[in-house]
Design a protein with these regions (language model features):
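Ubiquitin-like/PB1-type beta-grasp interaction modules and other compact soluble beta-rich domains
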Residues: 1-63
Length: 64
């Protein structure tokens, strides 16, 4: 699978099928600090991403 980290524009490739929570753990990211997007949809921590899919991981930015 192809993972694009934004806003860094860094790309990471992983082989096989992985649960989103496991992907975030492997990348050292905390679930509450990022959004995982497949196509036009948000993907939750419990969902799987297949080897032939691409996802984006975007930092969550909040302001007050």
């Amino acid at each position: 699978m192809r993972i694009t980290l934004l806003p860094q524009h860094k790309q990471v490739d992983l082989s096989g099928r992985h649960r989103v929570a496991d992907i975030l753990r492997q990348l050292g990211l905390l679930p509450g600090t990022v959004m995982v997007i497949r196509g036009d949809e948000l993907v939750t921590e419990g969902e799987f991403v297949e080897a032939d899919e691409a996802i984006e991981i975007r930092n969550v930015i909040s302001g007050g």
